[in-house]
Amino acid sequence: MGSVSYTAMTPLSFLERSARVWPGKVAVIYGRRRLTYSEFAAEVEQAARALRASGVQPGDRVAYLMPNLPELLIAHFAVPLAGGVLVAINTRLTAHEVAQILRHSGARIVVADASLLPTAMTAAGGLDAVTRLVVVADTEASSARAEQAVGPAAEPRLVSYREFLAGQAGDPLPWSVPDELDPIAINYTSGTTGLPKGVIYTHRGAYLNSLAQIIHSRHDENSVYLWTLPMFHCNGWCAPWAVTAIGGTHVCLREVRGEAIWQQLREHGVTHLNAAPTVVSAILTASQAGPLTRPVTVTTAGAPPSPTTIAEMERTGFKVVHVYGLTETYGPFTVCQPQPQWAGLPADQRAALQARQGVGMIQTGGLRVVDSAMADVPADGETMGEIAMRGNTVMAGYYLDPEATAAAFRGGWFHSGDLGVMHPDGYIELRDRAKDIVISGGENISTIEVEQALMSHPCVFEAAVIGVPDDKWGERPKAFVVLRPGTSTTVKDLAAHVRTRIAGYKTPRDIDITVKLPKTSTGKIQKYVLREKERSSHAHQVQG
């Protein structure tokens, strides 16, 4: 293919263009700190030169362990500009878990926030592959954190971010790549079923998914995007690249709390944010919550939002975009595309339609619900099968794991492990993870369906349902519920309410009203933690 009619796709071109088109426009806001697009590009080039000067060669992995700071946003461009591959690590992991990722990825350089330096140092302690530890002092955080960053250290590989960048000047770097299928990032899965797997993203996939985020989340040059979604989670659904591509403004946020989010919403005129439903719930129940003076588009994924949550968001002034995907699909892969006729429906009916996972996004290549023989299930909204995907934004594979890659890609499709149905209108609806489905007396019970029935109760803030052993039925559903602040109800009342929504055999016999539910850093409820507790409790009862 001739070079005149072909250019390798890379998100690097987004910042190169925006720095030319909007050089004086504010690109990044963090506390008192501001970066124009021209300054943003200059800091990216400086960091890329520092990485190269530290020995980063094409394809080398560079790990970042930090919250949503400007430095992590810069890294999404600087690391690939230097020819490296970005490995953004979950900040909630233990040193042992971080070490597993550093060891598997073979990261040469680790860049860490000062507050996470002890974790980074412990994790890198026995790894000779790590040649440099760079610590970032967050000047907008507490002075203690900043002082911690610049104090003396026995670790010879340690250097401050300021020292790391010092004196890095030279000729302009090329904002291009030789091959669009080269890796741009490796994102590690949660590892709830074993060791985390490294999911490879390419320049091409990141480029196309970024354009899809612009289209489906309705971004333009007036977008003010609040960073409530961790950048370490699927590279923030490619929003570092998407918002930059369209010339929007990034508002960085160190800690995701309801009050802090409302402050940013009002202070900076935020127009967009991405969040899991649990984060959305925290926003809605924050003490500063109130009607918005301008619409804010919330793109949400994770656990399917309940119709009750969607209706409440709309009343507050949030415009909901519901998407679905996995780490292996660069984050969002489907969108619940609104239809004009939905607007005239009652709120509860419209919300129920919007809670579905929808149709393939514009960049995708295929979306199916299949049975064990890879045949499409009937589009009847009832027959469950596994959701399978293929196309431009499915991962290149699992890093250094050809067997897991082959298993995930069997039959020429990516197997999600999620169970769902296909509706007659072509929209899919997630019913459960394959491991979360409850099989009671031979009947499949969708825990999501039970959770949504519970969430429709006015006192219920959050709900999680798992399967627990039952001598008669094999399994039965058990619910864990967090009530809304200032409300009260009884288990009997909750069960009676659920029976008005779903069949009696699906209604949990056991409902625990609790203070909080275990969650991941992105706000997803960790059902495996609940299952482990129940398993331990059941084993103790049997032994006792």
Regions inferred by a protein language model and the residue ranges of each:
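Conserved AMP-binding A3 loop
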Residues: 36-39, 184-208
